[in-house]
C-alpha cells in the first residue's frame, strides 16, 4: 500500500465514523481498527501501531467527555497528533552556523547514500540558497564509480570536492578532506560514506571509525521509503553505531509502501529534515511533519502552498497581483503569468496535494503530464497573441479571424484555441467572484483573513472543498496562515543564525 493509499484508507475510516449517528466505544474501536490494519499493511511496525492506538484511547476517553464536546473533532485531532508524533520525535536537528565549519556525515543502506541522482545537487541548491559555503568529501571507497559520481555532481553545482582514485582507506580520505576544507573556510562540509547493511560488521566498524576521526556535528541517515518491514531494525542498527541526528527519505513518490519510513524514524528518534518525492531537483523538499500529515489526510497545506507561490512570484509583483485580485481584473496575460508560476512551483501532483480537500492520488497516474502539456499548449497559443489581446479583459475581442490567426501562429487547430478561450472565460468568472476584497491593494496578505474577505473567497471554493476545510471558520484559519508570513524552518530543523 503506497503512502497516498494509506492516507485514503485513514480518511475513509474517519469518514465512516463521522457518518455514525452516535459516537460510542464501538464507533471509536471500528475506526481505530481500520486505521491499524491500514498502517500494518503499509509496513509500519506492530509495536508502533499498538502504541499509537493506546495513546489515542488515552486522549479520547468518551466517558469523561462532557456533553456538548465535539467527539468527532477530538478523535480526528488525536489521530492527526499521533501520526505527526510518528514522524516527529519532538527534537530539533543540529542547525549549522555560517562562517563556522560544520561537518555533516551521510550514512545509509547500500544503494541509497547519495546514489540517487537528485539528492546531492538538490540538497546543495537548498544549502547555497541559505548562504552557506558547502564542500563535498567522498569517503566511499567501496562502491565503484562513487568518486566519479560525486565529482560530476559537485562540478555541475560548482561545489568544491575532495576524493581519491588511488586511496583505499576511507578514514584517511575523510580526515584529509575535512581538514582541507576547514582551512579553506568552508562552513558546511559533507562527508559521503559507503552504503551498508546491518549484517556487514566490517562496514559498520568503518563507519564508526570515520565518525570518530572526523567528529561530525550531524550524522544524517538516508533511507529509501520502499525498504519495507526491515526499516526498523536497519535504522536501529545505524543509531546504535553512530549518533544519527537527522533523517532524509528518498523515493516518496507514491510507488513504495512507505510505512517502513514511519518505523525507521521511530527507531532513530531523529527528525526527518528532507524528503525526495521524485527523480528531479524540484522534487526534493524541506520536510515538516504537520503539513505532510495534513496533506496525507487530504486537509492540504496552505502555508506551504503560499510559500511555494511566494518563491515563484517576484516580491515586486505580489502587491500588483493582489490589487488586480481585489478589482476582479483578469486578463490573458495574468492567466499566462499564473500558468508559468504553476509550472515553476514544481510537480502539479505535489501542488495539488497542498490544496484542502485534495490528495495527490486524486490526480490519476499519467494525468499530471497531460495537464502540464495542456498548460504549455495554452501558453504557446498565447505567445501568438498581440499585446492588445493579452491585456484585454473582454473575451468578445476574439472574433473568427483572430482565432484562426492564433491557431496558425501557434501550430494548433481552431478547436484547441476555442478550448483555451473557454478555460479563460471560466477563470474570468471565478476571478470575478472575489471582486471587492478589501485592503489588498498594498499587498497586505493578512487582510485575507478578514471576515468579509473570507466570505467573498468562500463563494469561489467548491462546496465539498469548503466542507473539507471546516466551513467558514476553517477558511478564516487558513487565510490567517496565508497572511502570517511564517518563516520556513531552518536548514536542519533549526533557524538560520
Swiss-Prot record:
Name listed for the protein in its UniProt record: Signal recognition particle subunit SRP54 2
Main location: cytoplasm
Subunit structure: Component of a signal recognition particle (SRP) complex that consists of a 7SL RNA molecule of 300 nucleotides and six protein subunits: SRP72, SRP68, SRP54, SRP19, SRP14 and SRP9.
PROSITE patterns: SRP54
GO aspect biological process, one term: SRP-dependent cotranslational protein targeting to membrane
Leading EC class: hydrolase
Gene designation per UniProt: SRP-54B
Region (G-domain): 1-297
Amino acid at each position: 500500500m503506497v503512502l497516498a493509499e494509506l492516507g485514503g484508507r485513514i480518511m475513509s475510516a474517519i469518514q465512516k465514523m463521522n457518518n455514525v449517528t452516535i459516537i460510542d466505544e464501538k464507533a471509536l474501536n471500528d475506526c481505530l481498527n481500520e486505521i491499524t490494519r491500514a498502517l500494518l499493511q503499509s509496513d509500519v511496525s506492530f509495536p508502533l501501531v499498538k502504541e499509537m492506538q493506546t495513546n489515542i484511547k488515552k486522549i479520547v476517553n468518551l466517558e469523561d467527555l462532557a456533553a456538548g464536546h465535539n467527539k468527532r473533532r477530538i478523535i480526528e485531532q488525536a489521530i492527526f497528533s499521533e501520526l505527526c508524533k510518528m514522524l516527529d520525535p519532538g527534537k530539533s536537528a543540529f542547525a549549522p552556523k555560517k562562517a563556522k565549519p560544520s561537518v555533516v556525515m551521510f550514512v545509509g543502506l547500500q544503494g541509497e547514500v547519495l546514489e540517487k541522482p537528485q539528492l546531492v545537487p538538490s540538497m546543495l541548491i537548498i544549502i547555497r540558497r541559505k548562504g552557506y559555503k558547502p564542500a563535498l568529501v567522498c569517503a566511499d571507497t567501496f562502491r565503484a564509480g562513487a568518486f566519479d559520481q560525486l565529482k560530476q555532481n559537485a562540478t555541475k553545482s560548482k561545489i568544491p570536492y575532495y576524493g581519491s582514485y588511488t586511496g583505499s582507506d576511507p578514514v584517511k580520505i575523510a580526515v584529509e578532506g575535512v581538514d582541507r576544507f576547514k582551512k579553506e573556510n568552508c562552513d558546511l562540509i559533507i562527508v559521503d560514506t559507503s552504503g551498508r547493511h546491518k549484517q556487514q560488521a566490517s562496514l559498520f566498524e568503518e563507519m564508526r571509525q570515520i565518525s570518530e576521526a572526523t567528529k561530525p556535528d550531524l550524522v544524517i541517515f538516508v533511507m529509501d521509503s520502499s525498504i519495507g518491514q526491515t526499516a526498523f531494525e536497519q535504522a536501529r542498527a545505524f543509531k546504535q553505531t553512530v549518533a544519527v541526528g537527522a533523517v532524509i527519505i528518498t523515493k516518496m513518490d507514491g510507488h513504495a509502501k512507505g510505512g517502513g519510513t514511519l518505523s525507521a524514524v521511530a527507531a532513530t528518534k531523529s527528525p526527518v529534515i528532507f524528503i525526495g518525492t521524485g527523480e528531479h531537483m524540484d522534487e526534493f523538499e524541506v520536510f515538516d511533519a504537520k503539513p505532510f500529515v495534513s496533506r496525507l489526510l487530504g486537509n492540504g497545506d496552505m502555508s506551504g502552498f503560499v510559500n511555494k507561490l511566494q518563491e515563484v512570484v517576484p516580491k515586486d509583483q505580489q502587491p500588483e497581483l493582489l490589487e488586480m485580485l481585489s478589482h476582479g481584473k483578469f486578463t490573458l496575460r495574468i492567466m499566462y503569468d499564473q500558468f508559468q508560476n504553476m509550472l515553476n512551483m514544481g510537480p502539479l501532483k505535489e501542488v495539488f496535494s497542498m490544496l484542502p480537500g485534495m490528495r495527490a492520488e486524486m490526480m490519476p497516474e499519467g494525468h499530471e503530464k497531460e495537464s502540464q502539456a495542456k498548460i504549455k499548449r495554452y501558453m504557446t497559443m498565447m505567445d501568438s497573441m498581440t499585446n492588445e489581446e493579452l491585456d484585454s479583459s473582454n473575451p468578445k475581442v476574439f472574433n473568427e479571424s483572430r482565432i484562426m490567426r492564433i491557431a496558425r501562429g501557434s501550430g494548433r487547430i481552431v478547436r484547441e484555441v476555442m478550448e483555451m478561450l473557454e478555460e479563460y472565460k471560466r477563470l474570468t468568472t471565478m476571478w470575478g467572484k472575489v471582486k471587492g476584497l478589501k485592503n489588498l491593494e498594498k499587498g497586505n496578505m493578512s487582510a485575507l483573513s478578514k471576515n468579509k474577505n473570507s466570505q467573498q473567497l468562500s463563494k469561489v471554493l467548491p462546496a465539498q472543498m469548503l466542507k473539507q476545510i471546516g466551513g467558514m471558520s476553517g477558511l478564516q484559519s487558513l487565510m490567517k496562515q496565508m497572511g502570517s508570513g511564517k518563516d520556513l524552518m531552518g536548514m536542519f530543523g533549526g533557524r538560520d543564525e
